[in-house]
């Protein structure tokens, strides 16, 4: 702690010196507007570590999914157990799976202000306006779903004039994508505007099943449709309506014994998800404040299945080893938030205070139907083979009710004190066919206080203290109920206290845009999940146990720099440095002082953008991270990697032609690892890794109208 405090002091002093002594600015860099906060504000007024991905960065990605964009964000990782990444980690904090059907997210995930926490797989990014990744607890803004941070995606809103875009992509591994988005005023009435989006993405999936002689057992077959309507009812009242559907029909044949991209499964699984969403926003202006209502609902159907033995009769011979698992999941959510947002403060008019007050209600319902079957036989056993079959169902319902508020006070025209608080009540009801039932409740509170110094030229310096929280829960598969006396049944809420200082400034006549953040986080009652396999010969017999470690520590540095070397050449660097530690976990002394899972010490993205002529451009970037532990259940680690991507484009009037390569040097890198025995007859514990996508090449054509 002393070293960290000393580092923080040095960082603060140096940033203060540069902040007050270097001649900066002329406003040549376009102002970034924060859209994920309660009110849209310039980035200079933001008091969080947030990284922005604008529409140009998003359009430049050949594969339109947030999973691809996440590589550009330091201290953001994901667990690739499934066909699409659903679970993300920010600064080493976040779930890596969701097998049990009791949602409890650490990373908030909002798309157009609709909560998809724990369902990040649906985050297709065609016709997206901006993505904001908030690193650090958002206790006052979001509450229990954002202990580690928040991923906020804003799709394009309807425009006053008719406009649109279309895109066609073709690439190796069967990559084919087509999309169109358009909208504007409805007839001649500009009070009602709309935007319609249709998109289809397909790919073979970068794997080949040698047993079935097929290259599509991990294919991507994804569609996105979205309609947004904005209606200016009166001069004081505005309504926004959204309806969307994302349908991911993706088989999941991704795990292999040898870690290669050649699978052997005889019964490939599925990782499909279909989500229908509805949202209504109402804004009504009163004298001095605006009343806002956000109403949303989602309905999600998931099929998650897999060939648990990863092989076939020939690969396991002479042993009979054949297991399969399928989970059918239905999740429904309803969310209602009411806010009163004051008019912005203005020091020059003696308006020193701006405030937000509101209430939020979130209801979640989930049902799961799980079916497992298996067959195991040893040729030396005259009584085999032995068949197994297991089926269970469960129901889960939770409700979160919270009250929140935020007060900003202008101490001067350039100095603002901000204070926010949130109180939340959580109740859950769980029951299953195994006679397990639980009715836990928690009351939690969090908040934030910050001091922000800004200048008229767009630079800012801030210091903040924030507290986030995450509800507790219960462990399944112990054969116990809520009233049973066992220390392993329930676990407590986790709290995170985060200390942060940051700077956002422009240097050298605005040719450099620099953001830097130093943070230190204390985790109280850290929730740690470990898994065990009860029957080594049955890969479907894993149990999961979550316990509270006494504490954890996460601290580090985050930096983003964009530099215009010339009018036609620019470079960028995004860097994250992260140190994590598990401390004082009484039941797992072997993990004392070890780094937390999925928390690489260094993550980075750097690249250049070059415009050699008026009509051509070249973009190349390098992304990567250092090794990290796969789990808190074992000490196996990934290997460090760096991956390169290239885009070469030509622009002519409204047409854009692009040649792209992802994973330019065909880097072989792992994104997830399991440690258990899956090879008969001894079932020796072995590290099995899932590797990322190989090099793929394609062309994209875009027409804007």
Residue locations for each model-derived region?
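Transmembrane beta-barrel wall of Gram-negative outer-membrane proteins
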Residues: 163-165, 170-203, 207-250, 274-280, ...
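Membrane-embedded beta-barrel scaffold of Gram-negative outer-membrane proteins
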Residues: 281-308, 454, 458-466, 490-555, ...
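C-terminal beta-signal and adjacent terminal beta-strands/loops
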Residues: 571, 627-629, 650-705
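Structural signature of Gram-negative outer-membrane beta-barrels, strongest in the C-terminal barrel
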Residues: 230-235, 244, 340-343, 352-356, ...
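N-terminal periplasmic accessory domains that precede
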Residues: 31, 67, 87-89, 133, ...
């Amino acid at each position: 702690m002393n070293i960290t405090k000393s580092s923080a002091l040095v960082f603060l002093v140096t940033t203060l010196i540069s902040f007050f002594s270097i001649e900066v600015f002329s406003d040549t860099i376009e102002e970034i507007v924060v859209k994920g906060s309660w009110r849209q504000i310039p980035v200079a007024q933001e008091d969080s570590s947030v990284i922005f991905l604008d529409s140009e960065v998003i359009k430049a990605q050949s594969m339109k999914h947030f999973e691809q964009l996440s590589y550009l964000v330091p201290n953001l990782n994901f667990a690739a157990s499934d066909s699409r990444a659903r679970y993300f980690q920010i600064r080493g904090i976040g779930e890596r799976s969701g097998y049990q059907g009791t949602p409890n997210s650490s990373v908030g995930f909002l798309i157009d202000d609709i909560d998809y926490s724990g369902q990040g797989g649906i985050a297709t990014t065609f016709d997206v306006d901006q993505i904001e990744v908030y690193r650090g607890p958002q206790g006052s803004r979001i509450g229990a779903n954002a202990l580690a941070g928040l991923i906020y995606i804003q799709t394009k809103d309807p425009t006053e004039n008719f406009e649109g875009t279309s895109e066609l992509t073709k690439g190796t591994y069967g990559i084919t994508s087509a999309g169109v988005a358009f909208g504007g005023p409805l007839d001649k009435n500009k009070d009602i505007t709309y935007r319609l989006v249709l998109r289809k993405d397909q790919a073979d999936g970068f794997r080949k099943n040698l047993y079935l002689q097929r290259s599509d057992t991990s294919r991507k077959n994804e569609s996105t449709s979205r309609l947004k309507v904005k209606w200016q009812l009166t001069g004081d009242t505005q309504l926004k309506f959204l309806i969307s559907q994302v349908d991911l029909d993706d088989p999941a044949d991704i795990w292999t014994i040898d870690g290669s991209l050649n699978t052997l499964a005889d019964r490939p699984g599925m990782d499909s998800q279909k989500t229908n969403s509805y949202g209504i926003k109402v804004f009504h202006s009163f004298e001095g404040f605006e009343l806002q209502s956000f109403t949303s609902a989602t309905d999600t159907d998931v099929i998650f299945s897999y060939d648990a033995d990863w092989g076939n009769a020939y690969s396991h011979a002479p042993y009979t080893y054949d297991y399969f698992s399928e989970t059918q999941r239905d999740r429904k959510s309803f969310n209602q938030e009411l806010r009163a947002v004051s008019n912005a403060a203005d020091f020059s008019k003696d308006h020193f205070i701006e405030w937000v007050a509101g209430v939020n209600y979130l209801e979640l319902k989930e049902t799961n139907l799980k079916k497992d079957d298996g067959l195991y036989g040893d040729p030396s056993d005259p009584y085999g083979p032995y068949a197994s079959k297991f089926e269970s169902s469960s129901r889960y319902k939770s409700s979160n009710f919270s009250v929140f508020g935020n007060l900003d006070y202008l101490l001067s025209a350039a100095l603002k004190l901000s204070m926010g608080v949130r109180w939340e009540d959580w109740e859950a009801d769980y029951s299953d066919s195994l006679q397990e039932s639980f009715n836990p409740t928690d009351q939690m509170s969090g908040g934030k206080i910050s001091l922000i110094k800004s200048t008229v030229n767009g630079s800012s310096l801030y210091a903040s203290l924030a507290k986030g929280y995450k509800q507790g829960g219960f462990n399944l598969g112990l054969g116990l109920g809520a009233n049973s006396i066992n220390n392993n049944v329930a676990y407590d809420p986790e709290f995170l206290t985060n200390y942060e200082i940051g700077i956002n400034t422009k240097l050298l006549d605005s040719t450099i845009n620099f953001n830097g953040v130093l943070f230190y986080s204390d985790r109280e009652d850290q929730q740690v999940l470990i898994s065990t396999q009860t029957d080594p010969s049955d890969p479907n017999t894993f149990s999961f146990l979550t316990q509270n470690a006494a504490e954890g520590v996460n601290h580090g540095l985050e930096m983003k720099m964009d530099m215009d070397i010339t009018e036609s050449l620019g470079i960028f660097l995004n860097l994250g440095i992260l140190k994590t530690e598990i401390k004082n976990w009484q039941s797992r002394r072997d993990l004392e002082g070890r780094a937390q899972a999925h928390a690489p010490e260094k993550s980075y993205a750097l690249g250049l953008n070059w415009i050699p002529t008026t009509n051509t451009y070249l973009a190349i970037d390098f992304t990567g991270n250092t090794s990290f532990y796969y789990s808190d259940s074992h000490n196996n680690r990934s290997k460090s990697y760096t991956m390169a991507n290239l885009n070469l484009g030509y622009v002519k009037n409204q047409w854009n032609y692009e040649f792209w390569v992802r994973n330019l040097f065909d880097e072989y890198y792992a994104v997830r690892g399991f440690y258990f025995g899956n090879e008969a007859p001894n079932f020796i514990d072995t590290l099995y890794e899932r590797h990322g996508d190989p090099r793929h090449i394609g062309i994209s054509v875009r027409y804007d109208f």
